[in-house]
Every structure is written in structure tokens, then in C-alpha cells.
């Protein structure tokens, strides 16, 4: 049986932090159920991803955004209540990017995904 591609829509720009930088996200990403999706959130060059928590939210039509997780480092991260462990965060310092990885995609994962940054207390 062929799977219908699962389309993960991403907001192309969203703002966060005190100075309201523009965070860049690709306009969309698609994958099939059971596969993994890697969603990115690229910070402007004058802001170092290493100094910020990256927050991720999921929004489905007609519903408010749902907090998924935040990621600062492997030892400083947090999962939202009821959010499955197949949602995980990371960073790519060389690309100045925050990453949301969704493994074992399910049809219910079809949604808009938003990133937000906030300065870390650890920095």
C-alpha cells in the first residue's frame, strides 16, 4: 500500500527574542508516515545559536499553538507535557540553526511548526 506523502508546513518567518530577530524556516517539508522529518530554524548571522534556547511549537488548523520542546544542549532541554519522545531538538552550530527532528512520522503530525528563541541563562 502506498502512503500518501505527509506534508509538514512550516512558517517561512517567525519572530522571537527581545530584539525581534527574523528566524528563517523553509516554507514546507514533506515526508511519508514512518519516515523522519528534520525541520530547521536559522538564526541571523549576528545572533549565535549557541547562546539561545530554541523553542518549538506545533499548530493545527483551528487550534492554538502547542508547546513541543525547548533545546539548549543535550544536558539542558525540556519536553512539553504529553509530547512523545519521537520529537527531539538539536542545534547545528556551523549553520547557526536550531533543529526539530520528528521520527516515526504519523499522519497526526501534519501541522505548522514554529520556532522561537530566548537567551539562555547558561550563556
Curated annotation (Swiss-Prot):
Subcellular location: Secreted; Cell membrane
Region of interest called Framework-2, as start-end residue ranges on this chain: 54-70
Regions that span the bilayer: none
GO CC terms of this entry: extracellular region; immunoglobulin complex; plasma membrane
Disulfide bond residue pairs: 41-115
Function: V region of the variable domain of immunoglobulin light chains that participates in the antigen recognition. Immunoglobulins, also known as antibodies, are membrane-bound or secreted glycoproteins produced by B lymphocytes. In the recognition phase of humoral immunity, the membrane-bound immunoglobulins serve as receptors which, upon binding of a specific antigen, trigger the clonal expansion and differentiation of B lymphocytes into immunoglobulins-secreting plasma cells.
PANTHER family per the UniProt record, alphabetical: IMMUNOGLOBULIN LIGHT CHAIN
Name under which the protein is recorded: Immunoglobulin lambda variable 5-37
Provenance organism: Homo sapiens
Phylogenetic lineage: Eukaryota, Metazoa, Chordata, Craniata, Vertebrata
Amino acid at each position: 500500500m502506498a502512503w500518501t506523502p505527509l506534508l509538514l508546513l512550516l512558517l517561512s518567518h517567525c519572530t522571537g527574542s527581545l530584539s525581534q530577530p527574523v528566524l528563517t524556516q523553509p516554507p514546507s517539508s514533506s515526508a511519508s508516515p514512518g519516515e523522519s522529518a528534520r525541520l530547521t530554524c536559522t538564526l541571523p548571522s549576528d545572533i549565535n545559536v549557541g547562546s539561545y534556547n530554541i523553542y518549538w511549537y506545533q499548530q493545527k488548523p483551528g487550534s492554538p499553538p502547542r508547546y513541543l520542546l525547548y533545546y539548549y544542549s543535550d544536558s539542558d532541554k525540556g519536553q512539553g507535557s504529553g509530547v512523545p519522545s519521537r520529537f527531539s531538538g538539536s542545534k547545528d552550530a556551523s549553520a547557526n540553526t536550531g533543529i526539530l527532528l520528528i521520527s516515526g512520522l504519523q499522519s497526526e503530525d501534519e501541522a505548522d511548526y514554529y520556532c522561537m528563541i530566548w537567551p539562555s541563562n547558561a550563556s
